[in-house]
C-alpha cells in the first residue's frame, strides 16, 4: 500500500506518508515553553508510527501567538526546550518539523496588541488591530528569520511557515483582510510580497538541504470575493522556488459557512499539486485508511495529514498496518499487541 511507502523531500526521508498536522494544544503558559504535556503528546504519536510530525503553531514573537497558552520560539530558552522534544520524537523514527506563526489580528493574549496589514477586525467580537507600518513589517520578517535559525539550532528536520487559517501571512494574502494601498496591498503580486520576503529571509538561514513547507488556505469560502483556488495557484507560483511542499488547508481569514465532510479539502490539494507541480499535503476530516490510500493512489496529494484521528488514536499507523497485514517495524515494547 502506498500509505506505507517511504517518501523523500530533499534530505528528509519519511518512513510512511502519514503526517500529524500542527494542532494548537493551548497547553503552555505565558512563557511559551514546552512542558511535560507536549513531550508526551508528540512522542506518543512517534511511538505510534507517524512518519512526519509538525509541531503546533509556534509564535515568533509574544504577540505572534494565538493565545498566551501557545508555544513560542522568540528566545534561545525556547530552542533549548524544543531541542529536547526533537530528540525524543526522533528516537522512534519520526521526522519532525515546527510551524512558525504570527497570529496578526487573531492574537487574543495579553503580551501586546494585535497587528495586521489593515486596521480591520476579524469580526464584531474581535479587537481592531493596529495597521502595521513598513518598518514593523520588516521587524516581523526578521523575527521569522530568527525563529528559523532557532528551529535549526533545536534540530528540526523541516520548518513550516503558517500562511493559512486567517493568521498574519494569510491576512496579507487575502483581499478580505488586506486593504493596503502600498506595495503590500492591491494586486495578487503585492499581497504576496510579505510572504515572499518572509520566505527569502528564512532561506538565508535555513539549511539548503532541509525542506521548507508552506501551509495555505486555498479557499476563503466567500463567493469569490476572497482567495479562490485559482488565485492560490497564482500565489504558489510566485513563491514556488522558495518552498518544497505546500500543506493545503482552507478558511479562517473571515467568517464563512463551510460545508464540512470527510476529505472536504482534498480537492484543493489536488488543484495545487497539479497546477503548480509541487508536492502537497492533503488534510480535512480524513480518518480512514482506505480514504488515505485513495488520495495517494490517485495522485491527489503526496502526503496525508490526520488531525482529529491522531488525537483519537495515536496508534493509527500501527493498527492500520495490522488491519491490512502489512509488515512494518512495531515498537519493541508494543510488539505483542500488534503481531
UniProtKB/Swiss-Prot annotation:
It catalyses: A + NADPH + H(+) = AH2 + NADP(+). Its EC number is 1.6.99.1. FMN binds at residues 21-24, 57, 99, 215, 307-308. Its cofactor is FMN. Keywords: Detoxification, Flavoprotein, FMN, NADP, Oxidoreductase. Substrate binds at residues 26, 162-165. Signal peptide: none annotated. The keyword NADP applies. InterPro entries: Aldolase_TIM, NADPH_DH_bac, OxRdtase_FMN_N, YqjM-like. One of its GO terms (molecular function) is NADPH dehydrogenase activity. Pfam families: Oxidored_FMN. One of its GO terms (biological process) is response to toxic substance. Homotetramer. PANTHER family: NADPH DEHYDROGENASE C23G7.10C-RELATED. Catalyzes the reduction of the double bond of an array of alpha,beta-unsaturated aldehydes and ketones. It also reduces the nitro group of nitroester and nitroaromatic compounds. It could have a role in detoxification processes. Belongs to the NADH:flavin oxidoreductase/NADH oxidase family. NamA subfamily. This is NADPH dehydrogenase. The gene is namA.
Amino acid at each position: 500500500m502506498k500509505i506505507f511507502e517511504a517518501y523523500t523531500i530533499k534530505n528528509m526521508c519519511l518512513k510512511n506518508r502519514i503526517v500529524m498536522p500542527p494542532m494548537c494544544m493551548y497547553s503552555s503558559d505565558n512563557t511559551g515553553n514546552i512542558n511535560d504535556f507536549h513531550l508526551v503528546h508528540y512522542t506518543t504519536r512517534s511511538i505510534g508510527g507517524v512518519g512526519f510530525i509538525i509541531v503546533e503553531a509556534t509564535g515568533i514573537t509574544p504577540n505572534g501567538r494565538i493565545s498566551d497558552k501557545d508555544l513560542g520560539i522568540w528566545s534561545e530558552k525556547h530552542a533549548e526546550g524544543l531541542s529536547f522534544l526533537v530528540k525524543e520524537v526522533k528516537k522512534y523514527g519520526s521526522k519532525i518539523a515546527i510551524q512558525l506563526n504570527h497570529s496578526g489580528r487573531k492574537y487574543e493574549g495579553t503580551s501586546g496588541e494585535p497587528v495586521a496589514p489593515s486596521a480591520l477586525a476579524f469580526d464584531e467580537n474581535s479587537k481592531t488591530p493596529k495597521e502595521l507600518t513598513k518598518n514593523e513589517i520588516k521587524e516581523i520578517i526578521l523575527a521569522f528569520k530568527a525563529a528559523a535559525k532557532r528551529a535549526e539550532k533545536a534540530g528540526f528536520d523541516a520548518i513550516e511557515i503558517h500562511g493559512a487559517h486567517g493568521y498574519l501571512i494569510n491576512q496579507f494574502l487575502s483581499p478580505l483582510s488586506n486593504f493596503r494601498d502600498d506595495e503590500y496591498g492591491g494586486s495578487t503580486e503585492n499581497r504576496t510580497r510579505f510572504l515572499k520576503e518572509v520566505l527569502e529571509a528564512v532561506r538565508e538561514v535555513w539549511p539548503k538541504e532541509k525542506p521548507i513547507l508552506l501551509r495555505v488556505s486555498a479557499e476563503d469560502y466567500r463567493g469569490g470575493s476572497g482567495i479562490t483556488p485559482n488565485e492560490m495557484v497564482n500565489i504558489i507560483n510566485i513563491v514556488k522556488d522558495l518552498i518544497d511542499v505546500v500543506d493545503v488547508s482552507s478558511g479562517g481569514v473571515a467568517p464563512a459557512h463551510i460545508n464540512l465532510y470527510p476529505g472536504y479539502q482534498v480537492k484543493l490539494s489536488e488543484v495545487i499539486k497539479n497546477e503548480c507541480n509541487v508536492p502537497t499535503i492533503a488534510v480535512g476530516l480524513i480518518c480512514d485508511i482506505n480514504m488515505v490510500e485513495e488520495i495517494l493512489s490517485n495522485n491527489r496529494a503526496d502526503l496525508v495529514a490526520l488531525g482529529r484521528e491522531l488525537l483519537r488514536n495515536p496508534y493509527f499507523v500501527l493498527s492500520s498496518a495490522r488491519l491490512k497485514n502489512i509488515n512494518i517495524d512495531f515498537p519493541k515494547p508494543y510488539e505483542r499487541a500488534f503481531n
